[in-house]
């Protein structure tokens, strides 16, 4: 068995492969949204402090709600939890996008919606991690799946803001 095939062996599981691709797209979009929110706040205020505040506000709910989110994921069907949180993220993004598109967005809207997104992420992140283990039949590829999932998360963290920067540069 070659080294490359060992590196990606969890992708031989169809459910994990589909999950991996879908999660890659979703996370790149999430990181693009984070960058877009930062650009929006800076354009609204011209303030570096306000820019820092939007990131802080998004992180506030992660600490207390992550404990609850992990417990919730352990008690409910993970797939259903993920579907609900993805819909909530879509609604949050649509609200923010709609306000910005209509020219009605205020900084407090961005702060509030960032806080709500942080609360949803507190459930989404443990659900994603737990669901990954369900996508690999048998446990011989589980460590590989977890490693690929982690690498993909970090790649999305790099690619998403870079793509958002290109979009902002092109569209304005």
Task: Annotate each language-model stretch with its function.
Residues 1-172:
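Alpha-helical transmembrane-bundle signature of multi-pass membrane transport and export proteins
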């Amino acid at each position: 068995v070659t080294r490359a095939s060992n590196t990606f062996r969890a992708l031989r599981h169809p459910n994990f492969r589909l999950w991996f691709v879908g999660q890659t797209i979703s996370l790149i979009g999430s990181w693009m949204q984070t960058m877009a929110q930062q650009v929006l706040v800076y354009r609204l205020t011209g303030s570096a402090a306000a820019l820092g505040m939007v990131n802080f506000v998004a992180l506030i709910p992660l600490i207390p709600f992550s404990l609850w989110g992990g417990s919730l994921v352990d008690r409910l069907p993970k797939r259903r939890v993920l579907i609900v949180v993805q819909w909530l993220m879509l609604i949050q993004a649509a609200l923010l996008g709609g306000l910005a598109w209509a020219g009605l967005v205020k900084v407090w809207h961005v702060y509030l919606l960032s806080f709500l997104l942080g609360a949803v992420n507190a459930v989404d992140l443990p659900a994603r991690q737990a669901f990954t283990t369900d996508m690999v039949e048998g446990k011989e590829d589980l460590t590989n799946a977890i490693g690929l999932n982690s690498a993909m998360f970090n790649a999305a963290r790099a690619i998403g803001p870079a793509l958002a920067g290109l979009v902002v540069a092109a569209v304005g």
